[in-house]
């Protein structure tokens, strides 16, 4: 009995001593993060992951539904659509052909405080992805045809996802309108048809100029690439894009 007691005590002591040692072991789930800021203000975040020969890219702009003008509800989301309509150098459809044609995927989404554009593809596609993202950061194909087309697309999206979902769906639209008093938080980010139809090319050009500069963006790269190599690529494609003034942020984010 005494032998068992001593043995049990010894095992307990070993277990207790092992706790600090285990705590000192590196966390195998720690994700390596490297950051760098270009001279034009673009923030670059890179995480090397050699588990597969792929890469994920996310370009995030610090503008979302909260910053759209009061008479232009839904404009941030509409503008996200226009970012896929091509540029003078890379016409509409180029993004899809280059990325999806090489086995990758792409998408975009609009949130209250940011809008992001993502691509996942073989690592060999990283240079084309960065070139395309830099190209549409510089300018877009500002045309009445593209604007009218995407106004109709967004209105159809509203019909399908909001108006024809009487028993559920996008509850966050109703919650925001009921929970908050300030317009920035309680308006419908999808927008009204009247506001969407009222958007002009001048609105589009101004929004791109004010919010889609490198100093208002973060680009994240995760995948089969060394941080130094990724930083060099971003510098190559984005470094010459000049920083642009951004409108002052509203003084308060209070929702009271």
Report residues per predicted region.
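Bacterial N-terminal signal peptides
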Residues: 8-20
């Amino acid at each position: 009995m005494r032998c068992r007691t001593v043995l049990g005590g010894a095992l307990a002591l070993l277990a207790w001593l092992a706790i600090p040692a285990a705590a000192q072991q590196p966390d195998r789930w720690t994700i390596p993060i490297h950051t760098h800021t270009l001279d034009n203000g673009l923030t670059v975040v890179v995480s090397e992951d050699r588990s597969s020969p792929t890469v994920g890219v996310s370009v995030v702009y610090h503008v979302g539904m909260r910053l759209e003008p009061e008479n232009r509800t839904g404009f941030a989301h509409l503008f996200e659509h226009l970012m896929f309509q091509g540029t003078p150098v890379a016409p509409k459809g180029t993004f899809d052909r280059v990325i999806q044609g090489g086995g990758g995927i792409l998408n975009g989404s609009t949130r209250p405080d940011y809008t992001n554009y993502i691509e996942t593809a073989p690592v060999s596609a990283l240079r084309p992805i960065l070139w395309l993202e830099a190209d549409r950061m510089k300018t877009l194909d500002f045309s009445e045809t593209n604007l009218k087309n995407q106004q109709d697309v967004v209105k159809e999206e509203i019909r399908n996802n909001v108006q024809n979902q009487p028993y559920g769906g996008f509850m966050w639209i109703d919650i925001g309108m009921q929970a908050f008093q300030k317009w920035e938080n309680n308006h419908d980010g999808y927008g009204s048809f009247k506001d969407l139809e009222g958007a002009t090319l001048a609105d589009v050009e101004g929004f791109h100029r004010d919010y889609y500069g490198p100093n208002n963006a973060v680009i994240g790269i995760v995948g089969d690439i060394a941080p130094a190599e990724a930083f060099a690529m971003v510098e190559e494609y984005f470094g010459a894009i000049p920083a642009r003034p951004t409108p002052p942020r509203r003084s308060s984010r209070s929702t009271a």
